[in-house]
């Protein structure tokens, strides 16, 4: 049942008879570019954590990354893939929206980060579309709000035009600069 394997090695630890053998199997590719790395899962593969962990090992082994700020984009939620990324992080930025569903998922993600003993900061995206429950909960939990980004129709327009919104929408650029400053100050 190779499609069920998460690559964690748990079955090897559990098997007292040493009847299992670990076999390497390619599940994707790690690509390198100028200042950028990503992992691409092969079509039909469902388990990303081993690829993510391989990517994190490559980043850690890259001498050019020594002391550098490395940003790793993770999938949303608390899936195995998200856990694999957060486990290797020094600091986690969670992005949420001020809706009941957003707050529910944020609480789960914060709980995961706390269980992994990782510090967290939050960006509230489209901060003007919902209520203040999310911001209130974050303040009560003493979790820093790094930025509150309003709903910006120009962002959708920029994407529709094939533009990089961070460069073509000044309000978004300023918000991202404030998040970058918060990360730098945390370091």
Explain the meaning of each model-derived region.
Residues 1, 6, 10-26:
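Iron-sulfur cluster-binding cysteine motifs and their immediate structural context
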Residues 112-187:
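C-terminal lobe/tail of nucleotide-utilizing enzymes
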């Amino acid at each position: 049942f190779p499609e069920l394997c998460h690559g964690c090695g748990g079955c090897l630890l559990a098997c007292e008879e040493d009847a299992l053998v670990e076999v390497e199997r390619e599940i994707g590719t790690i690509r390198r570019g100028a200042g950028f790395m990503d992992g691409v899962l092969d079509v039909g593969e469902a388990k990303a954590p081993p690829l993510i962990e391989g990517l994190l090992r490559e980043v850690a082994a890259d001498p050019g990354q020594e002391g550098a700020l490395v940003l790793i984009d993770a999938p949303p939620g608390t899936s195995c893939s998200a856990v694999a990324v957060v486990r290797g992080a020094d600091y986690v930025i969670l992005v949420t929206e001020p809706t009941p569903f957003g707050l529910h998922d944020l609480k789960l993600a914060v709980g995961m980060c706390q269980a992994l003993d990782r510090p967290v900061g939050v960006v509230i995206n489209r901060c003007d579309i919902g209520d203040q429950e999310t911001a209130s909960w974050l303040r009560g939990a003493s979790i820093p709000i790094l930025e509150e980004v309003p709903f910006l129709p120009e962002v959708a327009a920029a994407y529709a035009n094939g533009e990089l919104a961070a460069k073509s929408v000044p309000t978004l650029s300023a918000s991202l600069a404030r998040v970058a400053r918060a990360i730098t100050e945390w370091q």
